[in-house]
UniProtKB/Swiss-Prot annotation:
Pathway assignment: Cofactor biosynthesis; NAD(+) biosynthesis; NAD(+) from deamido-NAD(+) (ammonia route): step 1/1
Domain of life: Bacteria
Native organism: Mycoplasmopsis pulmonis (strain UAB CTIP) (Mycoplasma pulmonis)
Alphabetical list of InterPro entries matching this protein: NAD/GMP_synthase, NAD_synthase, NH(3)-dep_NAD(+)_synth, Rossmann-like_a/b/a_fold
Entry GO MF terms: ATP binding; glutaminase activity; metal ion binding; NAD+ synthase (glutamine-hydrolyzing) activity; NAD+ synthase activity
Entry protein name: NH(3)-dependent NAD(+) synthetase
Binding locations of Mg(2+): D46, E146
Subunit composition and interactions: Homodimer.
EC code: 6.3.1.5
Cited HAMAP family: NadE_ammonia_dep
Family per record: Belongs to the NAD synthetase family.
Pfam family, one: NAD_synthase
A GO biological-process term: NAD biosynthetic process
């Protein structure tokens, strides 16, 4: 069990890291010659924390967007209202139900996951349209666990400009969100990608984020769980890379000589 001193040190480190992230976001936006940032708001803890960082980095030039599809966010709007009250972030709602239904019908995709992944990809396209309209960068909400596991949609929620919390484990996200006074209901909500009704991350993965946190911080966990986590990481390596390219023609020519 950690002592009070250790807990205080960890919280102080997280608070300092949060301050660093705010300055990092400012720097990256400045380097890109942009005016601010935009973030998709789901009602979950990851987007709530990124919303806090966005507002702190750009009090006048930050925007949150909710993008419900069907009933995917019907239970989240009360939490989003609390987040808006806390952060004072401007949050607008863009209902993508009709757009999704039309695209899904046109594509006529039968595979359940392929069809579900249209949702985050449609949201990505919407975020970038709004970001370009405002001359903003898009902030992603993937944490370290999700990034390591590849637990995101390629060119969906993984298609962003900046990933501010991608080096924070789930438990660290929770702790920093608590420091920023994010509502308890958001913090305690079961993690879900929202790809279909009643979907829960940990049920789909087959292990908990707590176990992933321990694995990522080099702590002891069940060897079978560790093997599953590492296998998931290896299988999703392509998600963390830009499109794979062949050998350069000059290198090819030199190799053939």
């Amino acid at each position: 069990m950690k002592s009070n001193t250790e807990i205080y040190k960890n919280l102080k480190l997280l608070e300092d890291y949060g301050t660093y992230l705010i300055e990092w976001i400012k720097l990256k936006v400045q380097q890109a010659n942009k005016k601010g940032v935009i973030v998709g708001i789901s009602g979950g803890i990851d987007s709530a924390l990124v919303a806090c960082l966005a507002k702190k980095a750009f009090p006048e030039n930050s925007l949150g967007i909710t993008m419900p599809i069907g009933n995917s966010m019907k239970l989240d709007f009360d939490d989003i209202a609390k987040l808006q009250k806390l952060t004072k972030l401007e949050i607008i709602n863009i209902d993508l139900t009709l757009s999704y239904d039309a695209l899904a019908k046109t594509l006529d995709v039968k595979n359940k996951l392929a069809k579900a992944n249209i949702k985050p990809r449609l949201r990505m396209a919407s975020l970038y349209a709004m970001a370009q309209e405002k001359d903003y960068l898009v902030l992603g909400t993937d944490n370290l666990d999700e990034w390591y596991l590849g637990y995101f949609t390629k060119y969906g929620d993984g298609g962003v400009d900046l990933l501010p919390i991608s080096y924070l484990t789930k438990s660290e996200v929770i702790s920093l969100a608590q420091i920023y006074k994010v509502d308890k209901g958001i913090i305690e909500k079961k993690p879900s990608a929202g790809l279909w009704e009643n979907q829960e991350d940990e049920k789909e993965l087959g292990y908990s984020y707590s176990e992933v946190d321990l694995f990522l911080r080099k702590k002891q966990i069940d060897s079978q769980i560790a093997t599953k986590i590492e296998k998931q990481h290896q299988m999703t390596e392509h998600k963390r890379q830009l499109a794979s390219k062949p050998m350069d023609i000059v290198d090819f020519e030199n190799k053939e000589r």
